[in-house]
């Protein structure tokens, strides 16, 4: 506590023995011990009161935050909250609408302004969309699955200077890629 070693205690004991005398030394040590005990109890009591005041301050802050949350949510009732949610989500899709394949009228169209702003070109007329969003649903709604149109494969000429590959070599390469 005071960083007093055994040698310092021995010196203090010898000085006390000479100054007080051997007859009164036990009474003096008892009195010093009682004072030390009182000082420790007072320090512990002060520390306990300080910790209690800190806990009360924390509880007051928690109560204040709880009251703010309660005041903010007091205007909301369960019915009011549900109506707000249903209004923001819109009407849910019906099961009959989900089972129907998308038709040309249901497919969303991209305006030329939106296509030029996004930097993408409009899809070709022959290209088929596999998944399309229904016009009545939002982006988070389910997608309708439509049959994919098969396009005729057109032969692509290799660039000049490319090595010649026989048809059998291409077929073997394709089979090897499918196997792995």
Curated annotation (Swiss-Prot):
It is found in: Cell inner membrane. One of its GO terms (biological process) is protein transport by the Tat complex. It holds the Pfam family TatA_B_E. GO terms for molecular function: protein transmembrane transporter activity. The chain crosses the membrane at residues 1-21. GO terms for cellular component: TAT protein transport complex. Keywords: Cell inner membrane, Cell membrane, Membrane, Protein transport, Translocation, Transmembrane, Transmembrane helix, Transport. Belongs to the TatB family. NCBIfam families: tatB. Part of the twin-arginine translocation (Tat) system that transports large folded proteins containing a characteristic twin-arginine motif in their signal peptide across membranes. Together with TatC, TatB is part of a receptor directly interacting with Tat signal peptides. TatB may form an oligomeric binding site that transiently accommodates folded Tat precursor proteins before their translocation. The Tat system comprises two distinct complexes: a TatABC complex, containing multiple copies of TatA, TatB and TatC subunits, and a separate TatA complex, containing only TatA subunits. Substrates initially bind to the TatABC complex, which probably triggers association of the separate TatA complex to form the active translocon. This is Sec-independent protein translocase protein TatB. It comes from Nitrobacter winogradskyi (strain ATCC 25391 / DSM 10237 / CIP 104748 / NCIMB 11846 / Nb-255). The gene is tatB.
């Amino acid at each position: 506590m005071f960083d007093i070693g055994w040698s310092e205690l021995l010196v203090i004991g010898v000085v006390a023995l000479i100054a007080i005398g051997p007859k009164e030394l036990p009474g003096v040590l008892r009195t010093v011990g009682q004072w030390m005990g009182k000082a420790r109890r007072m320090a512990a009591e002060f520390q306990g009161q300080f910790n209690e005041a800190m806990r009360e301050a924390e509880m007051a802050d928690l109560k204040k935050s709880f009251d703010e949350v309660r005041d903010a949510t007091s205007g909301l009732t369960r019915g009011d909250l549900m109506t707000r949610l249903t209004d923001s989500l819109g009407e849910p899709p019906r099961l009959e609408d989900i089972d129907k394949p998308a038709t040309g009228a249901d497919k969303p169209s991209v305006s030329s302004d939106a296509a030029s702003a996004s930097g993408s070109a409009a899809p070709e007329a022959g290209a088929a969309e596999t998944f399309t969003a229904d016009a009545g649903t939002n982006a988070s709604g389910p997608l309708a699955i439509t049959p994919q149109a098969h396009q005729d494969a057109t032969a692509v000429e290799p660039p000049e200077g490319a090595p010649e590959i026989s048809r059998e070599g291409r077929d073997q390469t394709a089979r090897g890629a499918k196997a792995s």
